[in-house]
């Protein structure tokens, strides 16, 4: 005798496997169609062109015409994969070249002369320059990007033939950038202050000076640490 199994779609993760009796509890690379579990479609190569350096950030989205966009930031360049277009180099003019590897600041002249006694072991307090990373988000169909080595906020205005440009009036020496669902562009570690968060006016990515007529502003996190990332 065959018994028809009618397992509801979706994964149950809120309790134990015993509590999830009759439900799927774990899966990977699957989807549900008409209440049945099926594998997702196969992967496709977007481009066979390789990068010249290490990719350190990526963000994908759809533009207003439902075209796919994938922005990739590497150590020294910024690229876009646009639907129907091969890889395009949209690296901003004058961007500071980043680092593939972290670098230790222990070379000659890194410490003060005579700071430690001769023959005494030095403390392990070396300073490091971290690898370059990118934060990338989309403001509508445009992309906003920032590399840690460079610190500027760049905007790419959804044109594969044009490079990204500096976002007008935005702070510099930032640690990262993100966009909220309410369409505020936010800078992390804004202006070189490692604990400052600064945001633009709503729906106006180039308005950063607070006024009674806009919603731009900033705050400083009450901590002695440094902002490294954010999520909205």
PLM region spans:
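N-terminal beta-propeller domains
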Residues: 1-116, 174-232
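Tryptophan-centric aromatic hotspots in well-structured domains and transmembrane helices
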Residues: 61, 134, 154-155
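A fold-level detector for beta-propeller and closely related beta-sheet-rich head/sensor domains
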Residues: 71-72, 148-149, 168
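Hydrophobic or amphipathic alpha-helical targeting/insertion segments
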Residues: 88, 140-163
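Beta-sandwich interaction modules
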Residues: 119-138
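Asp-box/WD-like beta-propeller blade repeats and closely related beta-sheet repeat scaffolds
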Residues: 126-129, 158-179
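Short, charge-rich binding segments
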Residues: 133-138, 144-146, 176-179
């Amino acid at each position: 005798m065959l018994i028809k199994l009618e397992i509801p779609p979706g994964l149950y993760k809120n309790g134990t496997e015993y509590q999830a009796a009759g439900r799927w509890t774990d899966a990977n690379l699957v989807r549900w169609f008409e209440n049945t579990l099926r594998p997702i479609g196969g992967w496709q190569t977007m481009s066979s062109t390789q990068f010249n350096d290490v990719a350190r950030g990526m963000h994908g989205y759809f533009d207003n015409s439902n075209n796919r966009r994938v922005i990739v930031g590497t150590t020294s360049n910024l690229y876009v994969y646009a639907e129907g277009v091969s890889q395009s180099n949209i690296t901003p003019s004058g961007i500071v070249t980043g680092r593939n590897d972290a670098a230790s600041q222990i070379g000659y002249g890194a410490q003060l002369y005579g700071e430690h006694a001769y023959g005494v072991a030095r403390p392990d307090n070396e300073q490091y320059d971290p690898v370059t990373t990118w934060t990338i988000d989309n403001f509508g169909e445009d992309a906003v990007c920032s590399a840690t080595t460079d610190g500027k906020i760049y905007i790419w205005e959804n044109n594969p033939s044009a490079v990204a440009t500096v976002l007008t009036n935005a702070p510099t020496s930032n640690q990262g950038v993100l966009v909220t669902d309410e369409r505020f562009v936010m800078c992390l570690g804004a202006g070189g202050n490692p604990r400052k968060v600064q945001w633009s006016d709503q729906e106006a990515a180039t308005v950063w000076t607070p006024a009674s007529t806009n919603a731009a502003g900033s705050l400083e996190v009450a901590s002695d640490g440094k902002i490294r990332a954010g999520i909205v």
